[in-house]
Curated annotation (Swiss-Prot):
InterPro entries assigned: Chaperonin_GroES, Chaperonin_GroES_sf, Chaprnonin_Cpn10_CS, GroES-like_sf
Record-given protein name: Co-chaperonin GroES
Database matches in CDD domains: cpn10
Protein family: Belongs to the GroES chaperonin family.
Self-association state and partner proteins as the record states: Heptamer of 7 subunits arranged in a ring. Interacts with the chaperonin GroEL.
Phylogenetic classification of the source organism: Bacteria, Pseudomonadati, Pseudomonadota, Gammaproteobacteria, Enterobacterales
Cross-referenced Pfam families: Cpn10
GO MF: ATP binding; metal ion binding; protein folding chaperone; protein-folding chaperone binding; unfolded protein binding
Main location: cytoplasm
Encoding gene, per UniProt annotation: groES
């Protein structure tokens, strides 16, 4: 199945969380929280401005991003893969 986000939304595949602390301790349970990094797999056309123009998104397919999984985030399971649908404003940074 193919998903195409609308407007200023993006589709993100969450990267695996690090299961060891910086000191080498293996993290389990709530300490091993879900990663807030992921890879953009699809993007919408852009945000519609008040004057009707479309502002292209700052992220593109393949970008690794740090995101805030907040109020607007939607998790979907597609082809046995968990993906997030986020607004571009939920993306905090691009990892370069």
């Amino acid at each position: 199945m193919k998903i195409r986000p609308l407007h200023d939304r993006v589709l993100v595949k969450r990267n695996e969380a690090e299961l060891k602390s910086a000191g080498g301790i293996v993290l389990t349970g709530s300490a091993a929280a879900k990663s807030t990094r992921g890879t953009i797999t699809a993007v919408g056309n852009g945000r519609v401005l008040d004057n009707g123009q479309i502002k292209p998104l700052d992220v593109k397919v393949g970008d690794v991003v740090i995101f805030n999984e907040g109020y607007g985030a939607k998790t979907e399971k597609i082809d046995n893969e968990e993906l997030l649908i986020l607004n571009e404003s939920d993306i905090l940074a691009i990892v370069e």
